C-alpha cells in the first residue's frame, strides 16, 4: 500500500483546527551525518495543546558496523542493534504516528529528510509541514551564545539525560518546543506582526508557530513597552530609593548574603583608609581575592557625593561585573549604576528602522532582523554585545552600529540608546567603563573624570591599553577598494568629488612610498586629507574616519603579506602615552589596583603610568597560582643562532611531541611568517591543526578550536591580548618567543629616542617591563576559571642564557611555579600536572 498525505489538504483540514493541531518531535540517530546514512535509533514525542500525549522509541538494525565515533557519541553498540528490528518492520507504525502532525526537530532538515527518504522506500510518502527548533531558538532567544540542543537545555533548564540517544533528545526538543511556543505567545501582537513580514525567510514551515501565536497575542502593554514607529522597546524598571550602606564592610557582605574572606576584609579596609588622602593609591592584590566587592562596597559607603568611575580591562569583564556584583548591589541597596561603552557598541534605531523597510536578498540578514525585533523587547541598553552571534553577519551589524551622532531630526531622538546611555552617566553614583573607552572619552572630555573617584581595576593592563591607544593602523589597500566602490555607486556629486580627492591623495602617497621607500607626511598634506574626510557624509568608511580623527603625532607606511597578497598598511602613533598622570584631569581620588606593582627590580607600575607626583602603595601577600605551571625548554636552541626555517622547524618538532599528550594546545607566535612556516611543517607531517589567517580569522578559528575540531591552534596578535579560553578544563599553552617589540619598528625607534633624551634606558625602563606585562597577560588567557588547569611551555632559551632572563623569571616566579628542563622531561612533568 502506498501512503500519501497532501500538504495543502493538511493545511486546510488540520492546521486551522487549533485544538486538533499536533506536533511530532522527532530525533534520529544514524550511522553518519551524510545523505546516505542509515537510521539506527528513532525517538518521537507527540505534543498537543502544549502537553506531551504520546511517545515512541526504537532501535533500528542498519545491517552494518558502526564507526567508532558514533559508538562513542551515542553509546549505541553493534551488539545492541543486532537484536533490533529492520526499519521496514517499524516504518508503517512510525508513519501512522506522525502522518497528521507537524514535523518538529532540532535541525529539521537532517531528521525530516532522512526519515522521509526511508519511509518512501517503504511505500509511505511523508509531506507534512516542518518546523526547525534551531532557527526558532536563534530568533526568539537572541542573546544566547550557542544553539546546540545541549547548550539550549543548559541555558533554559531543560532536562537532558543520555544526550545523543534519540528518545532523550526528542524529549528535550519537545520541552524546548513548548518553551518556544510560550515565549512567542508572550510577545506583543505588534512585534509578531512585523516578524511575520520576514518569516518566509525561516526554514521550511517554521512560520506556522508564529502565525498561531499571532492569532491570540495581546497588544502592547504601555506599562512594559514603548511603541513607536512600529518598533516595540522594553521600558526600564524604576529603581527604588537608594539605601545607605553600612560603614562596616563585613556587615554589607552579610546583607548581600556572603561571608567576607580575611584578605578581602584587609583589602576593603585599605581602600577605605586611603579614601581621604591626596595620593594616587596603588594596591597589589591577586585575582580570586574578591576585590570587586572589596572596593565597591567601601567606596559606595564613603563616596556619596562624588561619582565613582570603575575602569576594567575588557568589555567582557565590564559585562560580568554588571551582571554579577553590581546587579547584586543594586537589588539590595538600589544604588543607581550604569555601564557605558563607546557609541559603536549600541544599536542605532534609525539605521535598524531603515533596514526593516526592505527584504534583503540574504535570508540570514532577514532572520537577524527578526532576532533584533525580539531583542528590543528584552534589552534596556541596546548594547549589541548582548547579541552573541553577530559576527556571522558583521557587515550587516556594521550598518546598525551607532556613529555617536544624535540629532533632533532623528525619528528616535528620545529613545536613542546611545543618547540614553550618555545621559544616564550623569544620573549614576557608580559608572563602569573599560580601559579603551575611558581613554577615548577622557581625551575628548576631561570633565568626564574631573573631580570623580577613579578605580582602575587590573591597572597593569591599562599600560598595555595606553600603548594600543597611542597607536593605530589602516589597511590602505582595502580602503582604496572601498572608496572606489562607493565612487562607482549613486552618491551626491559633492561627495563623489571629495572621495575622488581622498582616493588620489592616498593612492599617490602609496605610489611615492613604493617608488622612494618612504613618504613625508607633511602637516599640509595631513590637514588637506583630514578636511576632506571630515566633510564626508557617506556610510562605509568608519575605519578611515576613525583613524584620521585620532590625535597621532607620527605616521608611516609598512607592507605586509597575507595569502601571498601584498598589503599596504598606514600606521599612526603618539609619543606622549607614557605620561598618563598628565592625561588625567584632577580627581577626588584615584586607585590603581593590580596583581603586579613591581614589574622588574627597577621599574614599578607607577613608573610606566607616568610618574604621579604623590603615591601610596599597599600590598596584600599572595600565593602562587596552583592551577598553572610554567616550564622553560632548556633544550631549545638560541633563537638568534637559527635561520627562520630552522626556528620554525624546531617549534614544529616540539609541537609534534606535545600533541602526544592529547591535550588542547594553544601556540602563541610573534610573527605571521613564522606561524605560516610552522603550519607548513605540520601540514607536511599530517598533524591536524588550525592556523589564524590560514584557516580563518581569529574569531572563527578560536570558535572551531573551542568546538574541538582540532586540538592544536596557532595564533598571533589578538591571541596574546584579547582572547580568553574558558571552554577547556585542561590546556597547554606554548609561548614560542618572548614578546619584545620589534627594534626596527618606526614607533619604537622614536620612543627610544624620546626616553633617551629623558635620561632613561629604553630597554630596562620600557621594553623589558612591557614584555613582562605582555607575558603575564598571555598567561592569563588560559586561567579564566577556578577548575581550569593549564601548563605553559616557553620555547625561548634567552630566559636561561641572557641576564635579563633572570629578571623575567623572577617576576613570573612570584605568581607561578617555574621549572627549567629539557623537552622530554618537560613533557613528562606536564602530563602528570594535567592529570
Cite the ranges covered by each PLM segment.
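Acidic two-metal-ion nuclease catalytic site recognized across multiple nuclease folds
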Residues: 2-18, 179-249
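A contiguous, basic/glycine-rich beta-loop/short-helix subdomain that forms a polymer-engagement track
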Residues: 405-426, 445, 534-642, 716
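Signature of the SF2 helicase/ATPase Hel1-core->accessory helical subdomain module
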Residues: 404-430, 435-534, 597-609, 744
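A substrate-engagement module of RecA-like helicase motors
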Residues: 248-250, 306, 315-428
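Conserved RecA-like P-loop NTPase helicase motor core
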Residues: 635-643, 697-796
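Acidic, Mg2+-coordinating catalytic module of metal-dependent nucleases/exonucleases
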Residues: 102-109, 113-118, 148-211, 792-794
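Walker A/P-loop
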Residues: 276-297
Amino acid at each position: 500500500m502506498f501512503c500519501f498525505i497532501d500538504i495543502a489538504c493538511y493545511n486546510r483540514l488540520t492546521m486551522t483546527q487549533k485544538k486538533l493541531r499536533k506536533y511530532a518531535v522527532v530525533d534520529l540517530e544514524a550511522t553518519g551525518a551524510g545523505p546516505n546514512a542509515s537510521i539506527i535509533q528513532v525517538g518521537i514525542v507527540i505534543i498537543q495543546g502544549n502537553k506531551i500525549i504520546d511517545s515512541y522509541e526504537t532501535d533500528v538494525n542498519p545491517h552494518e558496523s558502526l564507526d567508532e565515533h558514533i559508538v562513542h557519541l551515542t553509546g549505541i553498540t553493534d551488539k545492541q542493534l543486532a537484536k533490533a528490528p529492520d526499519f521496514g518492520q517499524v516504518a508503517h507504525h512510525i508513519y501512522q504516528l506522525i502522518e497528521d502532525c507537524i514535523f518538529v526537530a532540532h535541525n529539521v532538515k537532517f531528521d525530516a529528510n532522512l526519515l522521509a527518504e526511508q519511509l518512501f522506500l517503504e511505500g509511505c510518502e511523508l509531506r507534512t509541514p516542518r518546523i526547525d527548533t534551531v532557527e526558532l531558538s536563534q530568533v526568539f532567544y537572541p542573546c544566547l551564545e550557542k544553539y546546540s540542543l545541549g547548550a539550549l537545555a543548559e541555558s533554559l533548564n531543560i532536562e537532558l539525560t543520555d544526550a545523543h540517544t534519540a528518545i532523550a533528545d526528542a524529549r528535550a526538543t519537545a520541552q524546548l518546543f513548548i518553551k518556544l511556543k510560550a515565549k512567542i505567545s508572550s510577545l506583543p501582537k505588534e512585534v509578531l506582526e512585523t516578524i511575520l513580514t520576514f518569516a518566509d525567510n525561516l526554514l521550511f514551515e517554521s512560520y506556522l508557530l508564529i502565525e498561531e501565536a499571532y492569532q491570540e497575542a495581546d497588544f502592547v502593554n504601555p506599562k512594559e513597552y514603548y511603541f513607536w514607529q512600529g518598533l516595540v522597546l522594553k521600558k526600564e524598571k524604576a529603581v527604588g530609593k537608594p539605601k545607605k550602606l553600612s560603614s562596616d564592610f563585613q556587615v554589607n557582605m552579610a546583607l548581600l548574603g556572603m561571608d567576607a574572606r580575611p584578605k578581602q576584609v584587609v583589602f576593603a579596609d585599605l581602600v577605605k583608609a586611603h579614601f581621604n588622602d591626596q595620593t594616587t593609591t596603588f594596591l597589589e592584590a591577586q585575582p580570586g581575592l574578591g576585590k570587586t566587592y572589596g572596593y565597591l562596597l567601601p567606596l559606595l559607603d564613603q563616596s556619596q557625593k562624588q561619582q565613582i568611575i570603575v575602569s576594567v580591562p575588557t568589555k567582557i569583564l565590564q559585562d560580568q561585573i554588571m551582571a554579577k556584583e553590581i546587579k547584586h548591589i543594586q537589588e539590595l541597596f538600589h544604588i543607581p549604576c550604569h555601564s557605558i561603552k563607546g557609541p559603536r557598541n549600541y544599536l542605532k534605531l534609525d539605521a535598524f528602522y531603515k533596514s526593516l523597510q526592505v527584504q534583503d536578498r540574504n535570508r540570514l540578514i532577514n532572520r537577524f532582523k527578526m532576532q533584533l525585533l525580539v531583542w528590543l523587547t528584552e534589552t534596556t541598553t541596546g548594547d549589541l554585545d548582548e547579541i552573541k552571534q553577530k559576527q556571522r553577519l558583521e557587515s550587516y551589524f556594521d550598518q546598525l552600529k551607532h556613529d555617536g551622532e544624535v540629532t533632533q531630526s532623528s525619528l528616535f531622538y528620545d529613545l536613542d540608546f546611545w543618547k540614553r546611555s550618555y545621559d544616564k552617566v550623569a544620573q549614576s553614583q557608580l559608572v563602569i567603563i573599560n580601559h579603551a573607552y575611558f581613554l577615548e572619552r577622557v581625551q575628548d572630555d576631561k570633565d568626564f573624570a574631573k573631580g570623580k573617584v577613579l578605580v582602575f581595576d587590573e591597572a597593569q593592563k591599562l599600560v598595555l591599553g595606553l600603548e594600543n591607544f597611542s597607536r593605530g593602523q589602516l589597511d590602505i589597500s582595502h580602503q582604496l577598494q572601498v572608496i572606489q566602490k562607493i565612487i562607482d555607486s549613486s552618491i551626491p556629486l559633492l561627495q563623489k568629488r571629495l572621495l575622488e580627492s581622498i582616493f588620489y591623495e592616498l593612492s599617490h602617497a602609496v605610489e611615492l612610498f613604493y617608488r622612494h621607500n618612504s613618504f613625508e607626511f607633511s602637516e599640509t598634506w595631513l590637514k588637506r586629507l583630514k578636511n576632506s574626510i571630515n566633510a564626508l557624509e557617506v556610510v562605509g568608511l568608519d575605519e578611515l574616519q576613525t583613524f584620521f580623527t585620532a590625535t597621532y603625532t607620527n605616521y608611516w607606511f609598512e607592507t605586509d603579506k597575507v595569502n601571498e597578497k601584498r598589503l599596504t598598511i598606514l600606521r599612526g602613533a603618539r609619543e606622549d602615552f607614557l605620561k598618563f598622570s598628565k592625561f588625567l584631569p584632577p580627581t577626588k581620588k584615584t586607585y590603581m589596583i593590580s596583581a603586579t606593582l613591581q614589574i622588574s627590580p627597577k621599574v614599578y607600575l607607577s613608573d610606566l603610568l607616568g610618574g604621579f607626583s604623590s603615591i601610596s602603595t599597599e600590598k596584600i601577600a599572595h600565593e602562587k597560582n596552583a592551577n598553572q605551571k610554567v616550564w622553560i625548554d632548556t633544550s631549545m636552541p638560541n633563537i638568534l643562532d637559527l635561520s627562520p626555517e630552522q626556528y620554525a622547524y624546531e617549534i614544529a618538532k616540539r609541537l609534534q611531541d606535545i600533541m602526544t599528550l592529547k591535550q588542547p594546545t594553544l601556540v602563541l607566535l610573534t610573527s605571521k611568517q613564522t606561524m605560516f612556516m610552522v603550519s607548513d611543517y605540520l601540514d607536511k607531517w599530517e598533524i591536524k591543526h588550525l592556523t589564524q589567517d590560514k584557516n580563518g580569522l581569529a574569531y572563527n578559528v578560536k570558535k572551531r578550536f573551542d568546538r574541538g575540531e582540532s586540538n592544536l591552534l596557532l595564533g598571533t596578535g589578538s591571541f596574546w591580548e584579547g582572547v580568553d579560553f574558558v571552554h577547556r578544563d585542561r590546556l597547554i599553552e606554548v609561548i614560542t618567543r618572548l614578546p619584545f617589540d620589534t627594534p626596527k619598528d618606526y614607533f619604537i625607534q622614536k620612543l627610544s629616542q624620546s626616553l633617551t633624551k629623558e635620561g632613561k634606558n629604553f630597554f630596562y625602563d620600557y621594553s623589558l617591563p612591557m614584555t613582562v606585562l605582555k607575558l603575564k597577560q598571555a598567561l592569563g588567557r588560559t586561567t579564566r576559571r577556578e577548575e581550569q588547569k593549564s601548563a605553559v611551555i616557553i620555547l625561548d632559551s634567552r630566559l636561561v642564557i641572557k641576564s635579563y632572563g633572570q629578571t623575567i623569571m623572577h617576576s613570573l616566579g612570584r605568581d607561578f611555579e617555574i621549572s627549567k628542563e629539557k623537552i622530554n622531561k618537560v613533557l613528562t612533568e606536564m602530563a602528570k600536572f594535567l592529570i
